[in-house]
Amino acid sequence: MKFFIDTANINEIKEANALGVLAGVTTNPSLVAKEGVDFHERIREICNVVEGPVSAEVISLEADKMIEEGKELAKIAPNVVVKVPMTTEGLKAVKAFSDLGIRTNVTLVFSAVQALLAARAGATYVSPFLGRLDDIGHNGMDLIRQIAEIFAIHGIETEIIAASVRHSVHVTDAALNGAHIATIPANVIASLVKHPLTDQGIEKFLADWEKTQEK
C-alpha cells in the first residue's frame, strides 16, 4: 500500500516527503481555503515538491463546468489528478476526462456500488471515506474489502484510496483489506512512526552505552 498525504500545507508536504515514503498528495477546497492562498498557485507549488499524483478538486456541481475546471487544473502539471465528487454529474465528467486522457479521483464514496460506477466511468482512483462512515456507526473496512473484492473479480484497475483516515488502526486495516493507497493527515503520519516500546528501547540502549563510557 502506498502513502499519500492529505493536506494543502507546503511545509507538511515537504516534511512527509523527506521521510522517503510519500507517493502522492490529496487536497480539497477546505484544505486549500484553510491555507488562505490562491488555489491554482498552491497546486502548482505542491506539484513542484512531489513527483507523484496530486489530487485537485473541482468546485462546480454541473458536469460541463466540472470539465472546464478540470481541463484548467490538468494544465498546471502532468501529475495533477482531477478530483470529482461521486454524483451523477460527476460520473459524466469522469467519462469525459477519461476520454481526454485526464486522470481522476472520485471522492466521497460511501458504497461499493458507487465505487463500481466510478470505475466503469473511467476513474483512475476511488476514495471511500473511512472516518465519516465510522461516525455514523458503519464499518469503513467492510467497504474497503467489498470494493477490493469487486475490483479483483472483474479485473478493474482503478485504485482504492482509503480516505478520511483518523488514526494508525485505519492505516493498518486499510492495508489488510485491500486498499492500494491511504491518504493521511500530517498528524497521523507522524503518529505512525512512533511506538512507546521503540522509545523505551532507545532510552535503554543509550543508558547502557553511558554505563560503558563511565568505566
From Swiss-Prot:
Entry's EC annotation: 2.2.1.2
Listed SUPFAM superfamilies: Aldolase
One Pfam family per UniProt: TAL_FSA
Pathway where this protein functions: Carbohydrate degradation; pentose phosphate pathway; D-glyceraldehyde 3-phosphate and beta-D-fructose 6-phosphate from D-ribose 5-phosphate and D-xylulose 5-phosphate (non-oxidative stage): step 2/3
GO molecular function: aldehyde-lyase activity; transaldolase activity
Active site, UniProt feature: K83 (schiff-base intermediate with substrate)
GO BP, one annotated term: pentose-phosphate shunt
Subcellular location: Cytoplasm
GO cellular component, one term: cytoplasm
Function per UniProt: Transaldolase is important for the balance of metabolites in the pentose-phosphate pathway.
HAMAP family referenced in this protein's UniProt entry, alphabetically: Transaldolase_3b
UniProt name for this protein: Probable transaldolase 1
Gene transcribed to yield this protein: tal1
